[in-house]
Amino acid sequence: LTCVKEKSIFGVTTEDCPDGQNLCFKRWHMIVPGRYKKTRGCAATCPIAENRDVIECCSTDKCNL
């Protein structure tokens, strides 16, 4: 499985997930109202949302773009 690690104006950085990590995730963490920090990567299980974060998980290549 290949997941997106970073997305910027310079392009997309991907990572090949190690064995046992069969999900890609994308997390939005609110810094201040209207401003979010996005985190992407591989995971074995879908992370649990904390502090009003929004998390999406998926299981196909680059699905967390």
Curated annotation (Swiss-Prot):
Coiled coil: none annotated. The keyword Magnesium does not apply. PROSITE patterns: SNAKE_TOXIN. One of its GO terms (molecular function) is toxin activity. It is found in: Secreted. Keywords: Disulfide bond, Neurotoxin, Postsynaptic neurotoxin, Secreted, Toxin. InterPro entries: Cytotoxin_Cobra, Snake_3FTx, Snake_toxin-like_sf, Snake_toxin_con_site, Toxin_cobra-type. Expressed by the venom gland. Disulfide bonds join 3-24, 17-42, 46-57, 58-63. Negative results: has no effect on ligand binding to any of the mAChR subtypes at concentrations up to 1 uM. Monomer. This is Muscarinic toxin-like protein 2. It comes from Naja kaouthia. The lineage of its organism: Eukaryota, Metazoa, Chordata, Craniata, Vertebrata.
